[in-house]
Amino acid sequence: MKXMRKNHPLLKIVNHSFIDLPTPSNISSWWKFGSLLGICLMIQILTGLFLAMHYTSDTATAFSSVAHICRDVNYGWLIRYLHANGASMFFICLFIHVGRGIYYGSYVLSETWNIGIILFLTTMATAFVGYVLPWGQMSFWGATVITNLLSAIPYIGTTLVEWIWGGFSVDKATLTRFFAFHFILPFIITALVLVHLLFLHETGSNNPSGLNSNSDKIPFHPYYTLKDLLGILLLLMALMILALFFPDVLGDPDNFTPANPLNTPAHIKPEWYFLFAYAILRSIPNKLGGVLALILSILILAMFPLLNTSKQHGLIYRPITQTIFWTFVANLLVLTWIGGQPVEYPFTTIGQIASITYFTIIIILMPMSNTIENNIIKL
């Protein structure tokens, strides 16, 4: 079996990636989230596949087909809630994974980092088109508001929006194509994950100390497979608690009402994991400026490898940048809170301050603290 594992053309790839992979001996639990994201992706694809067997992407029947899944399909309610709450677990793991990358300086592996940003954007696109499918009030108005932002693009904006809609408003054509996108994008994400792993295994994994770990590596199996298994069990337990006891806690009550183009909800907002970007979008009074800020709020992650001037790898021995990092995390939580609040004083002001702070921390404060800490080392 051992000879087959090491010599068989297909098993050899699996062996080099998950069994005999040389892994730093000191990586902590923060490194578990990569494997947890893989599990989340598998759960989403499997539950999504079963939901797609019963869902109809037609404006007249989409809402009732989701109700039919919950009421008439065997364990349909469970599959639906695992899928909906699985998306939330996916984004929790994703945010922690990116946060760990920033904290421990994983962005120096620029190819892996940049593929990760593309993965993040693709996952956000998948979640957005998926949120439209139940065809509730918030699904419809969320799709209308977010796609309408593209009309801010000079010259081609209006044409582009109507092209995406497949008409002059969000309607049957929009729902059908969004279902097609939602079905195909997870498989594109899977392909990108393989590219992400390919680049990661070219350089080897980063580790908490930030030092070269080539002299101290252990095989991935059994050490980290068992460690990851614990994380997977905890993730599944959290997901089951969420899906069985609090299935609708992260959803929007407006989505229990079928989509009505003649009745606008009092407060249109996306799912909780987009609220930070939505708050940044709303904090700028100009439409085009808001759209640019929204895009930059994610693409700014690509600036980390370029703005990094530190002589040390990661933040483990850098107290000034550590403080700035945790301020950044707190600021993100404030933005998430503001994104879910109505557009009125004092929320608009807090949102504007938090949005300015978001970009200031990444572009100005972190590079400044790098320089200060480099000078402290010289003393």
Swiss-Prot record:
UniProt membrane topology term: Multi-pass membrane protein
Gene Ontology CC, one term: respiratory chain complex III
Subcellular location field: Mitochondrion inner membrane
GO terms (BP aspect): mitochondrial electron transport, ubiquinol to cytochrome c
Residues that bind heme b b566: H97, H196
Transmembrane segments: 33-53, 77-98, 113-133, 178-198, 226-246, 288-308, 320-340, 347-367
Record-listed a ubiquinone binding positions: H201
Cofactor binding note: Binds 2 heme b groups non-covalently.
Residues holding heme b b562: H83, H182
Record keywords, A-Z: Electron transport, Heme, Iron, Membrane, Metal-binding, Mitochondrion, Mitochondrion inner membrane, Respiratory chain, Transmembrane, Transmembrane helix, Transport, Ubiquinone
Cited Gene3D superfamilies: Cytochrome Bc1 Complex, Chain C (1.20.810.10)
Cofactor: heme b
Stored PROSITE patterns: CYTB_CTER, CYTB_NTER
Quaternary structure note: The cytochrome bc1 complex contains 11 subunits: 3 respiratory subunits (MT-CYB, CYC1 and UQCRFS1), 2 core proteins (UQCRC1 and UQCRC2) and 6 low-molecular weight proteins (UQCRH/QCR6, UQCRB/QCR7, UQCRQ/QCR8, UQCR10/QCR9, UQCR11/QCR10 and a cleavage product of UQCRFS1). This cytochrome bc1 complex then forms a dimer.
Known role: Component of the ubiquinol-cytochrome c reductase complex (complex III or cytochrome b-c1 complex) that is part of the mitochondrial respiratory chain. The b-c1 complex mediates electron transfer from ubiquinol to cytochrome c. Contributes to the generation of a proton gradient across the mitochondrial membrane that is then used for ATP synthesis.
Note: Heme 1 (or BL or b562) is low-potential and absorbs at about 562 nm, and heme 2 (or BH or b566) is high-potential and absorbs at about 566 nm.
PANTHER family: CYTOCHROME B
Name of the protein in its database record: Cytochrome b
